[in-house]
């Protein structure tokens, strides 16, 4: 699947694009990141962020995918977002999958405390 690429988009960027579109010229707009890449690369980057090993690669035949999934992976899904940028002034806050994965990782990773917790107080507010 290394040759099959597609674009992604962070939910925050979708919301920003929809809001920009409310005041923009009528029309259809593509909201996508600026860096289409393979699913393998995204999985590898996610594993790297999580400190996990990359999963073994599997052929499409061995994956036992549905006909719909096979059709999806048979094509490239590059999306151009230039119209939204030009006419709506939209700019993705997460221009590549890397920034998106880092944002998700930041909200799902446990915080590391640098000091012990403060003692509980008996005072009610």
Which residue ranges define each predicted feature?
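Substrate-positioning beta->alpha
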Residues: 1-21
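Residues within well-ordered alpha-helical secondary structure of globular protein domains
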Residues: 20, 48, 90, 103-107
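Mid/C-terminal beta-alpha module of Rossmann-like enzyme folds, strongest
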Residues: 14-69
């Amino acid at each position: 699947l290394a040759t099959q690429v597609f674009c992604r988009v962070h939910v925050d960027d979708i919301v920003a694009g929809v809001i920009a579109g409310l005041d923009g010229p009528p029309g259809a707009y593509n909201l996508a990141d600026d860096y289409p890449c393979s699913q393998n690369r995204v999985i590898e980057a996610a594993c790297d962020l999580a400190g996990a090993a990359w999963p073994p690669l599997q052929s499409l035949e061995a994956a036992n995918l549905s006909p719909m999934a096979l059709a999806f992976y048979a094509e490239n899904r590059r999306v151009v977002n230039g119209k939204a940028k030009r006419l709506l002034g939209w700019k993705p806050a997460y221009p590549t999958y890397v920034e998106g994965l880092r944002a998700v990782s930041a909200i799902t990773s446990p915080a590391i405390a640098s000091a012990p917790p403060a003692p509980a107080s008996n005072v009610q507010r």
